[in-house]
Amino acid sequence: MFTGTIFNSLFTLPLVISQFVPPPTRPVDLWDPFKTTTTPFPHGGVNQGLNRDEVVVRLPLGDIVGKEVHLHNLPWTIHKDPTEELPKDGTHFDPNPLKPKNNITVFTFLGVPYAEPPTSQRRFKPPQQLTVFPGKQPYLAFNYAASCAQDVEKSPSPFVDHPYPFMVDEDCLYLNIFSPDISKNAQTTYPVIVFFHGGNFQTGSANEWPAHGLASRGMVVVTVNYRLGAFGFMSMGDSETGNYGLQDQRLALEFVKNNIVTFGGDPQAVTVVGHDAGAASIGFHMQSPYSRHLFRSAATMSGAEVSYHSYIGKTALAFNNTMKLGRYAGCTQAVAQHRWDCILTRSTGDIIDATRNIPIEYNRYLFMPTVDGKYLPGNPLWTLVNAPSGETSIMSPVPMLIGMNAQDGSEVVLEDRRLGEFSQFNDVDHEYLKSYSLEYCYRHNYSMNREATADAILSKYTFWPDRAAAWAIKENFIQFATDAYYTAPMQLSSHLHSSSGSRVFQYVNNYNFSRQHPNLLFIPDWMGVCRDCDLYLMFGYPFLPDELRPIGLRGINFTDTDRNASRTFSNIIRRFSYHQNPNFQFDGSWAAYEPRRHWYINFNYTHEEDWKIPGTLARDYRYQDVAFWNEYIPALVNYMTTTFSPENVAYRREIMVFKWITGVNVIIIALLIVLAGAFGYMVWGNKEDEEAAYKAENHQLVEYRDTGHSVSDATISSRTRSPRSRITNL
């Protein structure tokens, strides 16, 4: 019995120990074992001091130097938010309330490499892990690195005449770190936000989203560059090529897991936040076996992995797009591998120019994530649909925050650069709506009832009281693009994830920024709640000085209402990163999304006191319109012009097969008849020709009168006979 007790203890001891694993701690600095300074000396073997606003941390890759940035007059601190002082009963307030204005220091490390440069022999290949920081030590992380190579003219922006503010290069695998505290004597670590930017996998950059304001809320924020377009997703249709951009993101997550504790972050408390293509990327990582255990929660904004426009489901299409790129880049080799090798010799500009000139037949773009059977094991929609039955599995069914902006589709208008250059995006008329509807159907390969499908879309989004009303046409076009590209996929993703094991919280941002004169330059009246408006709120730009805002937002006059909305929305992200639940501690009214109860928060603030609650709880956001795209349009596409009742589907197939066989038989019989006629003509026609020719010879035989003469003495016509005639007469 005693032996059995020891035996049981040996097997239960590891389980007991695992329950008391200590939280991650910051590494001990051999230059400063007693944690008396943030700056280790000497670094790089040189006894060199730092400027007052510079800080250095030590990683296994080498020393890295960043900067301090001071933010002033903020209504929160890194440890407390004003909403946390509001008790549920409304009577017992915090005895140590926050001051109305607080100063916070954020530590920034910009342009930090997380992989070897994907150039030269590493071009169009999976990213390789970095072993040491490049260049002279320590590594100076003071400025943003280059954005990934892209066609900057495709970027949806109201500033069509403004040059792109960052350099672009294929050497672009860098990230930016914003931390509220890197002191080695800190007693705690902070949750981590890893942000993947949007741009439909074609454009965008982490550099466009400075995160000082979000980091000041008590989170370590990491913004990531990843390869785009052909450079990130060109594929031969196999499991060895393509999806480089997704693999870049995964390697960045591994970098965070291995190093973020040095910057004050908790590697076990990582929340991935993605916008547009970044949101779809998160859905792909949740399904990929290669991204397991790299994050504990996810927030997807204005994008979904189930959208037709987020991935290429057929490897043959990915292969064909690559071959087209080769042809347009001047590579005409007949062997596919040789053409691929030729593309690798083309410059960055050559590839961008060739991609721009290729007509797109299917989907919105040529190069996107591909279902390769490896990194993306299966079709994302099919995987989610079959997950509840156990036929497929979601590798990372983490808690999710899913949301969008009310007019996300405005980016489709902004993407049309010609529309902006020639008419300031004003020439959206009925013909524009009609042509776009038909083009939408062509891109979706709606070969059945293509025109009927386009007519259904046009009918739904036509303003029938006045078909010529310009304001109504543009408004309806934006709603069409919003529903098709954002609302319907978001609702479908929420439904499937909530059915597959994830706890889902949904929001819709209906907050309109103030519209004074300077603001109209970056958010015109017609745009409504723009595609990036929730990011402006989340990153806290209304609280930042001009020099720390994105270039397009400098000079904007944000109001107190704007700041109030930003404070509340960023606190939603803060609560979710800390607790995987966006509810405030005194208010649990934000109900989770359910498959049959589609709860969401309508985020719309017009009064300053409204910041006390996260929004208005509602149900079934635009569900009638969602059904149009997710149910009616697919059914209409599959509807045959000549149809039978549903119960006779098998009989209909037999009829179709019979028609095909009958048609083929008729064609064969007709061919046989034609061949027989031709053969008969050759046989009988030649004989008739010979007889006619013989008669035409005008032969005259003389009556035989002398029995002493032979037939050769007979008198023959004076006309000369042909050799053939002689043979015949003999």
From Swiss-Prot:
Residues carrying covalently attached carbohydrate according to the record: N103, N320, N445, N512, N557, N564, N604
Chief location bin: membrane
Protein topology in the membrane: Single-pass type I membrane protein
Family: Belongs to the type-B carboxylesterase/lipase family.
Keywords for this protein: Cell membrane, Glycoprotein, Membrane, Signal, Transmembrane, Transmembrane helix
Protein name, as recorded: Neuroligin-like protein glit-1
Residue ranges annotated as Cytoplasmic topological domain: 685-730
Any GO BP annotation: cellular response to paraquat
